[in-house]
């Protein structure tokens, strides 16, 4: 007879069985649930992030000139070699004393001197010379959008550009009871996101700028230009200097000290404008630390002069009426600022509420920043554009490309960034007497590297000149002449010279010139050609523009993209750009007839052009 277990034991066994069934059911449910809802993906590996960083650099597609320009700003700074003039030679030569006996202490000194870092080793360990950029983050942004923005800023830091960030949020109305707390929360979100991307960041919640224009700035201001509404003294930059020297990205709130030393909220644009002016002044008073005698330099050396202004928002660049609301690609602020204000569609004030105020901010900041600096207005959807702008300092797409080419292959989108430069004034003259021949000759000879036959060249212009476009103080020019064509009642519009000083190549002057040339010649008659360049203001009938270039000219690739067609003539290549207004009228006929369709006015024109252009004498000695 088997003894029966006591009731308590039976109850315990029953509970154990129930628990086992419950755990089995939970495990089964968990298994099914994991099948229905896959677990979250693991965080991005460092290798994937590095690959993304490398791809962003490759997508920038920098040219050789772009690479040299980047290395000039961020590479190892060359040091001035020492000369004998720096040292005074002794007048009396004293024989050297007998060599002392080596001791433990002297051996230690010798070893220390032997292992002093050399300039070559220092350049390898610290290959990047860090510069600063002013960044405005115009929120609100979601966490995903903010991570995309901060990832781009961290990439910039790897390339030597350290951001000084000012955070603004439309989601925090001015006058809110908890306004200060909400703004600090936004700052902490940015700091957290930066550290999540592997950077070090420091929140600066105190006021750095002071309210009101700097005393005496009104007297120094230029006509038509107002100084910033905030100012900075060098001592106010201590928190930013400390953060940068510690390898941290400073993140600031738009606070300013008023006359009673109270911290009050100001517009982020006013805070950034004051920072731009103050940082440039501080850098000029205390220039970058010089290298040590052994050629090494401090690894924490940072130039406070901002090289870039980056405005990151929801919408991207400034909309343009010439591009049917798509963004401007490149803006010459000296020439186009007032025109953009006049042609800004009132409907864009709702879709792009900060476009005009950011345009004014860029104009103010670039007035204080170095001439090579630029500003970029970019959407949070295009963080890689920041890297492209840093390396190339050019717009995402060239503004001088034909409109059909930009919009036809989707190279232009509503979120395409806008690059802004201080730029140069553009003017048009139509008489040889209005040309400064000395400056024009210097420009042409420096650009082409040849000696100009001045008497023959200017003598021919007296008979054939149509117009001359001049950028700045003869920093660039486009000379167009009227060449008589046998058998035709209309002369040929011939681009005789297109030149830019070597010092201005790569800074946007070429695009500024070509856009003005387009508006004054083959683009004339279109509404978007009414630019304030001192020419015809878009009124008139466009004409075909013809020019030639040597077949081995490296600039021909640039010409191919901007011309309607080309014809090879031995050692020359003939280019032409058809009048766009006429093409617009005949666009439907071309589309229905196919590629072999030729208009009446096209018959025989290439032969006439080639025959006329080849007879133009050389302008060089």
Curated annotation (Swiss-Prot):
Any one GO MF annotation of this record: L-glutamate N-acetyltransferase activity
Cross-referenced Gene3D superfamilies: 3.40.630.30, Acetylglutamate kinase-like
Pfam families hit by this protein: NAT
Sequence segments annotated as region (Disordered): 213-233
This protein's GO CC annotations: mitochondrial matrix
Biological processes, Gene Ontology terms: L-arginine biosynthetic process; ornithine biosynthetic process
Transit peptide, residues from-to: 1-77
Entry EC number(s): 2.3.1.1
UniProt keyword annotations, A-Z: Acyltransferase, Amino-acid biosynthesis, Mitochondrion, Transferase, Transit peptide
Alphabetized InterPro entries for the sequence: AceGlu_kinase-like_sf, Vertebrate-like_GNAT_dom
Superkingdom, natural source: Eukaryota
Pathway, per record: Amino-acid biosynthesis; L-arginine biosynthesis; N(2)-acetyl-L-ornithine from L-glutamate: step 1/4
UniProt family annotation: Belongs to the acetyltransferase family.
Cross-referenced PANTHER family: AMINO-ACID ACETYLTRANSFERASE, MITOCHONDRIAL, N-ACETYLGLUTAMATE SYNTHASE
Identification of the protein by name: Amino-acid acetyltransferase, mitochondrial
Originating gene: ARG2
């Amino acid at each position: 007879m088997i003894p029966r277990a006591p009731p308590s034991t039976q109850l315990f066994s029953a509970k154990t069985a129930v628990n086992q069934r419950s755990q089995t059911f939970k495990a089964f449910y968990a298994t099914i649930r994991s099948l229905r809802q896959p677990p979250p993906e693991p965080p991005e590996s460092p290798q994937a992030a590095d690959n993304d960083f490398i791809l962003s650099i490759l997508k920038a597609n920098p040219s050789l000139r772009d690479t040299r320009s980047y290395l000039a700003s961020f590479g190892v700074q060359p040091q001035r070699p020492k000369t004998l003039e720096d040292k005074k030679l002794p007048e009396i030569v004293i024989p050297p004393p007998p060599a002392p006996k080596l001791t433990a202490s002297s051996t230690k000194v010798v070893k220390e001197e032997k292992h002093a870092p050399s300039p070559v080793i220092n350049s390898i360990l610290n290959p990047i010379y860090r510069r600063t950029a002013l960044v405005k983050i115009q929120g609100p942004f979601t966490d995903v959008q903010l991570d995309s923005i901060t990832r781009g800023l961290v990439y910039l830091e790897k390339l030597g550009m350290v951001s000084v960030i000012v955070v603004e949020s439309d989601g925090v109305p001015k006058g809110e009871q908890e306004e200060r707390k909400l703004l600090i929360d936004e700052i902490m979100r940015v700091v957290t996101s930066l550290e999540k991307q592997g950077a070090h960041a420091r929140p600066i919640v105190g006021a750095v700028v002071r309210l009101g224009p700097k005393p005496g700035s009104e007297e120094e201001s230029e006509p038509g230009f107002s100084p910033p509404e905030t100012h900075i003294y060098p001592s106010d930059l201590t928190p930013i200097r400390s953060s940068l020297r510690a390898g941290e990205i400073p993140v600031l709130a738009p606070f300013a000290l008023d006359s009673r030393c109270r911290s009050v909220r100001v517009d982020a644009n006013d805070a950034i404008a004051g920072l731009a002016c103050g940082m440039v002044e501080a850098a000029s008073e205390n220039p970058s630390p010089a290298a040590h005698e052994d050629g090494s330099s401090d690894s924490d050396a940072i130039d406070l002069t901002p090289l870039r202004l980056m405005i990151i928002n929801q919408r991207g660049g400034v909309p343009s009426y010439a591009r049917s609301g798509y963004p401007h690609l490149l803006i010459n602020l000296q020439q186009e600022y007032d025109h953009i204000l006049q042609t800004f569609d009132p409907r864009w004030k709702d879709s792009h509420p900060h476009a005009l105020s950011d345009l004014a901010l860029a104009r103010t900041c670039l007035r204080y920043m170095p001439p090579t600096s630029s500003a970029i207005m970019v959407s949070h959807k295009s963080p890689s554009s920041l890297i492209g702008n840093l390396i190339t300092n050019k717009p995402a797409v060239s503004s001088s490309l034909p409109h059909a080419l930009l919009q036809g292959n989707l190279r232009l989108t509503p979120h395409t960034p806008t690059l802004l430069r201080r730029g140069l004034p553009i003017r048009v003259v139509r008489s040889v007497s209005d040309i400064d021949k000395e400056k024009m000759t210097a420009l042409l000879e420096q650009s082409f590297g040849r000696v100009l036959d001045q008497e023959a060249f200017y003598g021919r212009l007296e008979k054939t000149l149509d117009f001359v476009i001049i950028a700045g103080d003869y920093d660039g020019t486009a000379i167009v002449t009227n060449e008589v064509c046998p058998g035709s009642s209309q002369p040929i519009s011939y681009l005789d010279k297109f030149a830019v000083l070597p010092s201005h190549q790569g800074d946007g002057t070429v695009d500024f010139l070509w856009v003005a040339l387009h508006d004054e010649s083959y683009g004339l008659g279109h509404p978007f050609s009414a630019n304030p360049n001192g020419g015809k203001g878009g009124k008139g009938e466009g004409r075909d523009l013809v020019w030639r270039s040597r077949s081995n000219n490296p600039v021909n690739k640039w010409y191919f993209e901007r011309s309607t067609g080309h014809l090879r003539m031995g050692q020359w290549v003939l280019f032409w750009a058809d009048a766009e207004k006429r093409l617009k009228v005949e666009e439907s006929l071309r589309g229905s007839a196919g590629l072999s369709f030729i208009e009446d006015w096209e018959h025989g024109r290439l032969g006439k052009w080639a025959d006329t252009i080849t007879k133009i004498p050389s302008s060089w000695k």
